[in-house]
Amino acid sequence: MAGKSIFDKLWERHVITGQEGQPQLMYVDQHYIHEVTSPQAFQGLRDAGRKVRRPDLTFGTFDHNVPTVNIYDIRDVISKAQIDKLSENVKDFGIEHAAHGSELQGIVHMVGPETGKTQPGKFIVCGDSHTATHGAFGAIAFGIGTSEVEHVFATQTIWQVKPKKMLVKFTGVPPKGVYSKDFILALIARYGVAAGVGHVVEYAGDAIEHLTMEERMTICNMSIEFGSKMGIMNPDQKTYDYVQGRPGAPKDFEAAVADWKTLVSDPDAVYDKVIEIDVSQLAPMVTWGTNPSMGVEFGAAFPEIRDMNDERAYNYMDLSPGKKAEDIDLGYIFIGSCTNARLSDLQLAAKFVAGKHIAPNLTAIVVPGSRPVKRVAEKMGLDKIFMDAGFEWRDPGCSMCLGMNPDKVPDGVHCASTSNRNFEDRQGFGAKTHLCSPAMAAAAAIAGRFVDIRQLPEVQ
């Protein structure tokens, strides 16, 4: 009998009823919520006279609509209504939350792990497509819609069809200047944004094992851009060390770890598809188009037009085949988002700007992903490094990742961004987004354009 993958083992633990191949009722261990996808779900409960079944397994935070200059100066009527409504709802339904402006507040996919609520073995959902981030801990984690949010509120369960399994093996040692963001951007550039559709993607290989937990979260975060709503990794000692000592960590930690050690893929586990990538052959990545698969290694020319999507992307981005990333005149730099706003991301970016100054006529902002990250970064002096270099140092929030708050890229301006999506108008109407690592974004802020960070002393 064939072995089982970590996903198989976790799925079996959480099935309540139903046959494989058909929708199965799954038990939810942890439900994260934020202000945008929860209001209608709460109203549905009120209309039906229901309560939240397990408020103790639900946790809320404020992130999408939060201003990052003055977090209380919410001028957009809809944004203010959503934030006020979540404040009211978590109080009325007895849900633990990181209050707006509190010492825990931040992006939901950062706050969850930081509180220790994200753990190996859990089945986690949230009304946000980047919930796969939590899969880096050895958890099943995926985004759900608002009607499903209401269903989880009422029942602590969700109906799901078990997906196929894909194994992506990253092997080798990455060259200097290549980071986990480049791993996932390279995967998407090679195989496309639909390659993972219908699959859970397990990321494995020695290159993954050598990554920190924060670097692993970056990869799982962008599973949805690969077409899969779930990404997962085997937990190991790094995982246990990350969780230990946090407020939400299991009280009997040794017993928990003993259990978690059984939740790894068997050597003979079977997958529906296997992809292998040698990271020693990778280079820093930059996207040129309007979806994450439209990316190239630094130094490579942008491809010829292959279809109408390419033509539209080139027209929107005001670029053309044959040009290179270094030819782009950048106007904005954004270092932040649930992909790359963790402490290690900020430390990495700071290395490239220390003692320097951003290029003229360029706006650069750094948005720590959570209040705890901001607090520690400031103790380390990172805020001063960035501000001395001409960056704006902001309060936590989703910020410029998406145009749902005051942080927007102006029409027609090219932005080097550490976020996860480069769709048309994603960062503001007419904004032209180029996805890259924190190192590439920081170095670009100094030069005013993308540069080959492999040649810089900061990576030597």
From Swiss-Prot:
SUPFAM superfamilies, alphabetically? Answer: Aconitase iron-sulfur domain (SSF53732)
EC number of this enzyme: 4.2.1.33
Query: Which cysteines are disulphide-bonded?
Result: none
Names of the cofactor(s): [4Fe-4S] cluster
Q: Which GO terms describe its biological process?
A: L-leucine biosynthetic process
Q: Which InterPro entries match?
A: 3-IsopropMal_deHydase_lsu, Acnase/IPM_dHydase_lsu_aba_1/3, Acoase/IPM_deHydtase_lsu_aba, Aconitase_4Fe-4S_BS, Aconitase_4Fe-4S_dom, IPM_dehydratase_rel_enz, IPMI_cat
Which residues are listed as membrane-spanning? none
Function comment: Catalyzes the isomerization between 2-isopropylmalate and 3-isopropylmalate, via the formation of 2-isopropylmaleate.
Q: Which NCBIfam families match?
A: leuC, PRK05478.1, PRK12466.1
Q: What is this protein called?
A: 3-isopropylmalate dehydratase large subunit
Specify the species. Answer: Streptococcus gordonii (strain Challis / ATCC 35105 / BCRC 15272 / CH1 / DL1 / V288)
